[in-house]
């Protein structure tokens, strides 16, 4: 009992009272960031741990680091998953650099996304892979175990956090990021989508993962090759404001005299 307790037994209660004195404002213990020259130089040098394997990107940005939020935006069927499969699985990509990568798929079937990763790693079509499995194994097997795919259909960002906390990937791909929103995949509320982006960014910082957040662009981006962050579906500036890097992907419109078979 604290009523007749001695100094030792009263200490827990005394700490509580001291922390909540002055109109119950708690005293907060904080840790200061090391702002020494050596630490800031070391931190700056590690900002590009995961290098881009696309030369034009590498020349502009070099790469990204754990704890960052990287947004990829495009219209449907323009190439979001093909783009991140290239960054992750193609030669000299993040898997080849040693990253442990987790792909959370809530749009396409995970097997379809995994097939894109396999073709990116091998440089072969599915037909070519079927005809020459030995070559496919030689090219794909060295990185296969570094990349894991999970069906995340109907899951929330809270669920994604639990998975990331448990499995501790270096890189996690949210495909599609906005569909992890707590209010459901169909929400167009900018405040909800911004909160979802903040949550994704915080997950990356808390667990030391680079978060790749794929998102759809609105109908305003249809047929255009010059894109802007204002074209992100439902998000306005919230998602852009949270991102460390955003890349929007466009597809050149077909020429007037092209046929359906033209690329």
Where do the model's predicted regions map?
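Phosphate-binding/switch region of NTP-binding enzymes
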Residues: 73, 77, 196-263
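Structural motif
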Residues: 71, 171-175, 212
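Phosphate-binding/switch loop-helix module in NTP-utilizing enzymes
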Residues: 148-206
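Cytosolic-facing regulatory segments adjacent to core modules
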Residues: 59, 95-168, 182
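Short, well-ordered alpha-helix to beta-strand connector turns
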Residues: 67, 169, 243-244
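The Walker A/P-loop phosphate-binding site
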Residues: 24-123
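Short, small/acidic-rich helices and loops at N termini and domain boundaries
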Residues: 1-34
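Amphipathic alpha-helical transducer elements in NTP-driven molecular machines
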Residues: 51-54, 111, 136, 157, ...
């Amino acid at each position: 009992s604290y009523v007749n307790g001695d100094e030792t037994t009263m200490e827990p209660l005394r700490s509580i009272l001291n922390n909540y004195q002055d109109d119950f404002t708690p005293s907060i213990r904080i840790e200061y960031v090391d702002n020494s020259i050596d630490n800031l130089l070391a931190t700056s040098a590690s900002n590009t741990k995961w290098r881009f394997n696309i030369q034009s990107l590498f020349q502009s940005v070099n790469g990204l680091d754990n704890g960052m939020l990287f947004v990829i935006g495009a219209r449907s069927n323009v190439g979001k998953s093909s783009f991140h499969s290239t960054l992750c699985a193609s030669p000299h990509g993040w898997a080849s650099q040693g990253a442990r990568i987790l792909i959370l798929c809530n749009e396409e079937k995970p097997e379809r996304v995994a097939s894109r990763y396999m073709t990116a790693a091998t440089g072969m079509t599915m037909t070519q892979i079927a005809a020459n499995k030995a070559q496919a194994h030689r090219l794909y097997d060295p990185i296969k175990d570094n990349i894991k795919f999970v069906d995340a259909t109907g899951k929330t960002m809270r669920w994604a956090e639990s998975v990331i906390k448990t499995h501790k990937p270096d890189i996690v791909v949210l495909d599609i990021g906005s569909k992890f929103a707590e209010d459901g995949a169909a929400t167009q509320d900018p405040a909800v989508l911004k909160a979802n982006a903040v949550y994704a960014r915080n997950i990356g910082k808390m667990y030391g993962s680079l978060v790749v957040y794929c998102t759809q662009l609105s109908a305003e981006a249809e047929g255009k090759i010059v894109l802007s962050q204002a074209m992100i579906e439902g998000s306005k500036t919230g998602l852009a404001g949270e991102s460390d890097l955003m890349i929007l992907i466009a597809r050149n419109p077909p020429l007037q005299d092209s046929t359906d078979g033209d690329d």
